[in-house]
Amino acid sequence: MDLSIPNPVADATRQVEGGSPAGGQPLEIDALIVGAGPVGLFQVFELGLLEIKAHVIDSLKVVGGQCVELYPDKPIYDIPAVPSCTGQELTDNLLKQIEPFEPTFHLGQEVSVVERRDDGRFFVETSLGTRFITKTIFIAAGVGSFQPRTLKVDGIDKFDGKQLFYRVKDPSRFHGRNLVIVGGGDSALDWTLDLVGKAESVVMIHRRDGFRAAPASVAKMKELCEQMEMQFLVGQISGYEEKDGVLTEIKVSGADGVTRRLPLDDLLVFFGLSPKLGPIAEWGLDLERKQIKVDTEKFQTNIPGIFAVGDINTYPGKKKLILSGFHEAALAAFGAAPYIFPEKKIHMQYTTTSPKLHKVLGVESPVFD
């Protein structure tokens, strides 16, 4: 089971590392999408059908959002006409679908400034200094940027990235090592099961005997414990020991009042990811429980020209489904068109029959006898 995440930006898209063009002038664009998850990617597609080119910003360094950050190899069953696909496969297919529109990605950066200009457009600047003047903004940031929930033990953060890890990028790095894995969710169980037999030893720690993970994974973990392939302890990490700057032991306080000392090479902590709206919360948008209120005609916010699609928005009857986000992206694209083409009447066309859309998509129009 390889859960490492490659950078999946397709060849037909452009990725920009940051900074504005030569001369320091902002990029003047029609549409800026904040969030490169499935809904943000489909927003590129829907805008592309209307001949609107998009730039995409994401705080992660890879495209895919929650799908590749949380469940790249887990099956998704509720995408229409796709009986089953993984989060990574869904992302790859969406990237393939948007290739004709050649979006530009600005990864590893967050929007830090949004200002309305006198001409109705928006000035936007990112944390890396990339600047835009855009006619429309689409917020497709899921539930915000994700940060791992960290282990609250004084001083242990000094080992972060050396012997303390909150994500696994290269599983082989832990082969032959003595591991302690902490957590009670799917990520903790998945990595425990994957690394047993590859690591020198595995001890799993959770604060209680109940789990928030798939029952089959829990059963398999307990079976491995019975076979003496690994150990499981109920308790919480309360301290550690180091020697010459190297983490050598952790202290685990159990419910029985006993503190145990565990030698280790690496500590893997999976307490989940904490979603944060970040700077979006300061844009002057109407919020309800950290979600952006929108209308259901165009999924526009209280600020004309700014739209919100996917899990980050809220409206009566809202369901947090990828399917719902795709629907919202389609209507948001049509809602944005008048800001970009104020003199142009937008006609409804269908990809099955429209020669114009076939040209936009780079496909041949079918000829029927």
Swiss-Prot record:
Cofactor binding note of this UniProt entry: Binds 1 FAD per subunit.
Pfam families for this protein: Pyr_redox_2 (PF07992)
List of residues binding FAD: 58, 66, 71, 111, 146, 311, 352
Catalytic reaction annotation: 2 reduced [2Fe-2S]-[ferredoxin] + NADP(+) + H(+) = 2 oxidized [2Fe-2S]-[ferredoxin] + NADPH
Cofactors required: FAD
Annotated SUPFAM superfamilies: FAD/NAD(P)-binding domain
EC number from the UniProt entry: 1.18.1.2
Region span, Disordered: 1-21
This protein's UniProt keywords: FAD, Flavoprotein, NADP, Oxidoreductase
InterPro entries in UniProt: FAD/NAD-bd_sf, FAD/NAD-binding_dom, Fd--NADP_Rdtase_type_2, Ferredoxin-NADP_redctase_2
Molecular function via GO: ferredoxin-NADP+ reductase activity; flavin adenine dinucleotide binding; NADP binding
Keyword Transmembrane helix part of the UniProt annotation: no
Family, as annotated: Belongs to the ferredoxin--NADP reductase type 2 family.
Assembly: Homodimer.
PANTHER family, per database record: THIOREDOXIN REDUCTASE 1-RELATED-RELATED
Protein name in UniProt: Ferredoxin--NADP reductase 2
Species in which this protein is naturally found: Cupriavidus taiwanensis (strain DSM 17343 / BCRC 17206 / CCUG 44338 / CIP 107171 / LMG 19424 / R1)
